[in-house]
Design a protein with these regions (language model features):
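Short, non-transmembrane cytosolic segments of multipass membrane proteins
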Residues: 1-11, 137-148, 223-236
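Interfacial helix-loop-helix hairpins and adjacent transmembrane helices
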Residues: 6-16, 232-263
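Generic alpha-helical transmembrane segments of integral inner-membrane proteins
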Residues: 40-48, 117, 121, 216, ...
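Membrane-interfacial helix-loop connectors
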Residues: 106-108, 122-181, 185-193, 199-209, ...
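Juxtamembrane and boundary regions of transmembrane helices in multi-pass small-molecule transporters
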Residues: 165, 170-178, 188-190, 197-246, ...
Length: 395
């Protein structure tokens, strides 16, 4: 008798097996692992999740946070600061065109916060309920065509919250090739939730079709990048091994604690750099440096991309935070639908922010971080410019 047979004999001797009727969640959990009805349920889950994030986010933005910022907070801070600080650079940095307490509150609280909060509400629920691992199993064949295993889907989805934890989460990959590919895919084509919130706000004045096209473009770039990298990077991708927990309702206390922790990290890791970038924008505007930089970048910004000259601030601030490549576009009057889509495309594909560059350097090396940053920047300008030029050619 070999070791395995001996182990089975001992287990059978000491284990008591009782037949019980599976609960509804047990039956649903098992069904979600099969192509039918698993794939329709998975697609419905994704659609409902996006509906909650975008629909409820727009409601919070329009009826609660928008009035709170525009009618209460901004007038309050303007009154206080105007009374305390006299006209000058400091006054303009605080409540001017790019003021911390004017445009800063609008971008952070009204344009981005509702979508970030709802993303983490939905993602944490999918994570704690056991739905995410089942999605990984169902989409394993699709993920393998991208050169990674299905289990990597969870890590990539995490990138829609923030690229930093997604890159750190790539440590779970079983090969170096897969880990590098996951990190590159997140940097090239996955918008963080702050950037997604800014894009939703940008396209709200035009058509929801633009947002759909943007995500289709993101997916297309993701497939192309993964296909190219799978041929360039040497190595293999191991078969998927993933633990499938029971399908259950999340524990309320643990769920709330996780949600609070993620929002705390968002405010510390995202909003502080965003405030810094707003200060930089205000200083560039007040000192006249913005106009000087715009002169040198005008052939790219206005000529190739077809964007207004003032959009140069988006390219500068996007280096600090990805959503800041979108936020300045919200303030440009007379922006056309094509310009909004081109600007959104460049922002979507633009180089990783400073925090992502830092984590890439730490997890891999500085050479890899520089290579990804240069490649994403060139890709963003190339794709954005091609869309603009082709649109003018056929329109």
């Amino acid at each position: 008798m070999n070791t395995w047979d001996r182990a089975r004999e001992i287990a059978a001797r000491v284990r008591i097996k009782t037949e019980g009727k599976p609960s509804f969640l047990d039956r649903l959990g098992n069904s979600m692992l099969k192509p039918w009805p698993g794939i329709p349920i998975a697609l419905l889950t994704i659609i409902v999740s996006l509906g909650v994030i975008i629909g409820a986010g727009k409601f919070l933005q329009e009826y609660i946070l928008g009035p709170l910022v525009g009618d209460v907070l901004v007038p309050f801070f303007k009154m206080i600061i105007s009374y305390i600080v006299s006209e000058g650079i400091l006054h303009n940095v605080l409540i001017g065109e790019y003021g911390i307490f004017t445009i800063g509150l609008e971008w952070i609280i009204e344009s981005i916060l509702p979508f970030v909060f709802l993303f983490y509400v939905v993602f944490s629920f999918l994570e704690d309920s056991g739905i995410l691992p089942r999605l990984s199993v169902l989409f394993d064949s699709i993920m393998r065509k991208m050169g990674v295993q299905g289990g990597s889907m969870i890590t990539i989805l995490l990138g829609y919250g923030c690229a930093v934890p997604a890159i750190i989460g790539s440590r779970t990959a079983t090969t170096k090739k897969e880990r590098l590919m996951i990190s590159a895919i997140v940097c090239f084509a996955v918008p963080c939730i702050s950037q997604t919130g800014a894009l939703i706000s940008l396209f709200a004045g035009f058509s929801p079709i633009l947002l759909v096209l943007m995500f289709l473009l993101s997916f297309a770039v993701m497939m192309i990048v993964s296909s190219v990298l799978s041929r360039i990077i040497k190595g293999k991708v191991d078969p998927m091994i993933i633990e499938i927990p029971n399908l259950l309702m999340p524990n309320g206390k643990a769920y709330a604690k996780k949600l609070m922790l993620r929002m705390k990290n968002f405010f510390l890791d995202a909003e502080v750099p965003m405030l810094i970038s707003i200060v930089i924008a205000a200083l560039l505007k007040e000192t006249g440096l913005l106009e000087k930089i715009a002169v040198y970048l005008e052939p790219i910004v206005s000529g190739w991309l077809g964007l207004p000259r003032s959009a140069v601030i988006a390219l500068i601030l996007g280096i600090i935070r990805r959503e800041m490549a979108v936020a300045p576009l919200l303030e440009i009057e007379g922006l056309t639908a094509l310009q909004a889509f081109v600007g959104g495309t460049v922002a979507l594909l633009y180089l990783p922010c400073l925090s992502v560059f830092g984590i890439l350097s730490k997890e891999f090396n500085t050479k890899t971080a520089l290579a990804i940053s240069l490649a994403t920047t060139l890709n963003a300008l190339l794709v954005g410019g091609l869309i603009n030029q082709l649109a003018h050619l056929f329109m």
